[in-house]
């Protein structure tokens, strides 16, 4: 493994390179992928709007994340890039908008992974936090015998109610819809 990172208040960049042989095993850690060589690069820039003009907006952070992997077990190459922007607000408010494009190997085939995603959360009150996420686009149906390209639409939302240090209740909702891309058939 090799890693490099550099950051200031305005900029951050990082890169990473690693290789795990097919026979690699580590019993004391969770490792879900071996037999690959992986490299990624990340870059961000931070903008701090004028608090007098935009008192509710704390920071704007465009960023990119790019990853390339040669996978010996799945017999192919994976590549994806994420182009995104994060918005940081008062009350621990946060919104992330991104577009993921790329492809991945599975069972000797190549599948597209193009998706739009939105993530958000906020601490509305000391005792109430909320979140909502959505994702839509191409996805893979991971059947080891007969995988295929699909389209997935995912939404999730929820809240945590914590009126005291002794009581915390979270309620979450998640819906995932997956359709076969070739026919539109719901899976």
Predicted features along the sequence, with ranges:
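Exposed, low-structure sequence patches enriched in small/polar residues
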Residues: 1-187
